[in-house]
Amino acid sequence: MAKYKALASLRYLACLVFLPWGISISFQKGLEPWVTNWWNTGQSREFSDYLQEENALERFGEIEELFLLERMVEDSSETHSQDLRIEIRKKTIQLVEMYNEDLIQIISHLLANFICFATPGAYFILGKEKLVVLNSWIQELFHSLSDTMKAFSILLVTDLCIGFHSPHGWELMIDSISENYGFSHDEQRISGLVSTFPVISDTIFKYWIFRHLNRISPSLVVIYHSMNE
């Protein structure tokens, strides 16, 4: 019975971790042609204006100013003027293509991420019995450990996952999420989140854990404080 519970729990946990990721990637690859077609038919004009039109226009202006400045120091003959117009046109077309590709990727990521978040919710609802088995197995596994191992496990999880001892990991994660949703890299925003969110999460998690553990195993709290010092 214990072996069956362990296998069922590990299988459920693996599906919970990898299934949303796999479905998200599959849907994203399937959605990209549809989003590209929708984008190129002109039905997305308002969405485009809402997202990044101002940034795109600024970049168009920058390109034109750059080439004008470059050509001003050269001969201002008719041939050079013609070359300038052709070069600006080529660069503008390239920028429009890059702009469209970026927005198509953003829309595809948004739809795929929505599906990725919806999948675990549906899996929780449809697999309530398996969730109960997983919860029971985790509790049995945790309570079977010695108090020293329990304290070590809690210390490892809190410091590694939600603690404030790994700012570089948090920076990479926040930057990756921001890029995935189409936001530009903002060092000030990332630094603000890294300096506040992990500390708050760590405090709340430890308070919740030891409010519960103080009732069932006071010795565990003593061991934890000794190891933490």
Curated annotation (Swiss-Prot):
It catalyses: K(+)(in) + H(+)(out) = K(+)(out) + H(+)(in). The chain crosses the membrane at residues 7-27, 106-126. Pfam families: CemA. Its main location: plastid. Keywords: Antiport, Chloroplast, Hydrogen ion transport, Ion transport, Membrane, Plastid, Plastid inner membrane, Potassium, Potassium transport, Transmembrane, Transmembrane helix, Transport. InterPro entries: CemA (IPR004282). Contributes to K(+)/H(+) antiport activity by supporting proton efflux to control proton extrusion and homeostasis in chloroplasts in a light-dependent manner to modulate photosynthesis. Prevents excessive induction of non-photochemical quenching (NPQ) under continuous-light conditions. Indirectly promotes efficient inorganic carbon uptake into chloroplasts. This is Potassium/proton antiporter CemA. The lineage of its organism: Eukaryota, Viridiplantae, Streptophyta, Embryophyta, Tracheophyta. The gene is cemA.
